[in-house]
Amino acid sequence: MGEDELALLNQSINEFGDKFRNRLDDNHSQVLGLRDAFKDSMKAFSEKMSLKLKEEERMTEMILEYKNQLCKQNKLIQEKKENVLKMIAEVKGKEQESEELTAKIQELKEEYARKRETISTANKANEERLKGLQKSADLYRDYLGLEIRKIHGNKLQFIFTSIDPKNPESPYMFSMSINEAKEYEVYDSSPHLECLAEFQEKVRKTNNFSAFLANIRKAFIAKVHN
């Protein structure tokens, strides 16, 4: 074989080697590309499956929670049903007691109305009596130096003057009212008189109010001179 033929053979061998290596490089690149694509696909599939599993777990938990809630609701409904049935039975068993209670309430209402009317009548009578006392006060004022004022609590305040000759305008006073028993009730005086309780007892027995006022005035005069 001549040199030209050897050179041509070597050239052919080299060209074939280059083509083979290029083909191997291309195949290797394709294999690597396929491997990477497969990895990406598997990763995406794995993530998708993981999300799906988590979603299924969440749905399972929700279903279990719903079942638990449903059981609780059913239990509560059953308890309420039993309570309602019990209440119905109690109501049916207490119909007579309810009627008696209604009658008792009506009786109490009527009694309250009677008492309210009695109190109202007593208050009106007391007001009329106080008005009478106030009217009498106008007469006493000119002759005994007495002034009568209505103060809080439906009380009357009796104020005497011309008791002390040295100070005729100096006030001497006591207060009184008519209690629920329609009796005179005397309160403290200024200055204090030890005989107030005695005078109160006497006017309750005699109902002589003029004498009562005269005795109070005399007691104040005696206190000034003593």
UniProtKB/Swiss-Prot annotation:
One of its GO terms (cellular component) is cytosol. InterPro entries: Spc25, Spc25_C. Acts as a component of the essential kinetochore-associated NDC80 complex, which is required for chromosome segregation and spindle checkpoint activity. Required for kinetochore integrity and the organization of stable microtubule binding sites in the outer plate of the kinetochore. The NDC80 complex synergistically enhances the affinity of the SKA1 complex for microtubules and may allow the NDC80 complex to track depolymerizing microtubules. Its main location: nucleus. It comes from Mus musculus. This is Kinetochore protein Spc25. Belongs to the SPC25 family. Residues 72-128 form a coiled coil. Component of the NDC80 complex, which consists of NDC80/HEC1, CDCA1, SPBC24 and SPBC25. The NDC80 complex is formed by two subcomplexes composed of NDC80/HEC1-CDCA1 and SPBC24-SPBC25. Each subcomplex is formed by parallel interactions through the coiled-coil domains of individual subunits. Formation of a tetrameric complex is mediated by interactions between the C-terminal regions of both subunits of the NDC80/HEC1-CDCA1 subcomplex and the N-terminal regions of both subunits of the SPBC24-SPBC25 complex. Pfam families: Spindle_Spc25. Residues 147-226 are annotated as: Interaction with the C-terminus of SPBC24. The keyword Cell inner membrane does not apply. Gene3D superfamilies: 6.10.250.1950. Residues 1-58 are annotated as: Interaction with the NDC80-NUF2 subcomplex. Residues 1-146 are annotated as: Interaction with the N-terminus of SPBC24. The modification Phosphoserine is found at residue 12. Keywords: Cell cycle, Cell division, Centromere, Chromosome, Coiled coil, Kinetochore, Mitosis, Nucleus, Phosphoprotein. It is found in: Nucleus; Chromosome, Centromere, Kinetochore. GO terms for biological process: attachment of spindle microtubules to kinetochore; cell division; chromosome segregation; mitotic spindle assembly checkpoint signaling; mitotic spindle organization.
